[in-house]
């Protein structure tokens, strides 16, 4: 099969100065001309980081609903090292023209991750944790799929930094 090299739009590494200990390098993207499957390998140096990927068409990100078919070392916290990989199946996720696709790989500190966290509760993958930017970006067609009632626990971040709150009743009760 003939492999098409995809341009890497960005190695978007948006870490603050205090978190600049992680970086992505040796990023290689290819796309199989027959199956349209996109494959990527990369190296993460420094601290563990949350690695996410974004698909762009004509420089614009596609809707999160089409990103559910990423597999591998993506949408999760990844330890530093070489040989990390991910793949995306546009033939299953996105009906658009595959020739205009570029991809953006991004590493962030785990505490700065996206709003949605999914814990796999199935026996063979118990404890597998993935992160997603929106409910629409969840695999299997989104939050309304029954898999999120039986095999996967979806949690949404509640921004509460600096908020003082008490749990329980006061001592006078």
Explain the meaning of each model-derived region:
Residues 1-8:
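Bacterial N-terminal signal peptides that target proteins for export
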Residues 19-33:
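Short, compositionally biased P/S/T/A/G/V-rich stretches that sit at domain boundaries
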Residues 36-40:
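Structural beta-strand segments of beta-rich domains
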Residues 43-48, 57-59, 92:
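Extracellular acidic, Ser/Thr/Pro-rich low-complexity tracts
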Residues 45-50, 160-163:
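Short proline/glycine-enriched turn/loop motifs at strand-loop junctions of beta-rich domains
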């Amino acid at each position: 099969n003939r492999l098409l090299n995809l341009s890497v739009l960005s190695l978007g590494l948006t870490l603050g100065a205090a978190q600049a200990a992680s970086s992505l390098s040796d990023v290689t993207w290819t796309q199989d001309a027959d199956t349209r499957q996109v494959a990527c390998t990369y190296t993460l140096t420094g601290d563990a980081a949350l690695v996410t990927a974004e698909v762009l068409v004509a420089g614009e990100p596609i809707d999160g609903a089409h990103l559910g078919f990423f597999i591998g070392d993506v949408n999760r916290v990844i330890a530093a090292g070489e040989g990390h990989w991910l793949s995306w199946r546009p033939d299953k996720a996105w009906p658009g023209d595959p020739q205009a696709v570029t991809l953006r790989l991004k590493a962030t500190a785990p505490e700065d991750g996206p709003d949605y966290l999914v814990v796999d509760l199935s026996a063979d993958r118990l404890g597998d944790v993935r992160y997603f930017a929106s409910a629409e970006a969840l695999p299997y067609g989104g939050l309304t799929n029954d898999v999120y009632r039986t095999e996967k626990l979806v949690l949404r971040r509640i921004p509460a930094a600096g908020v003082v709150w008490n749990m329980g009743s006061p001592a006078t009760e």
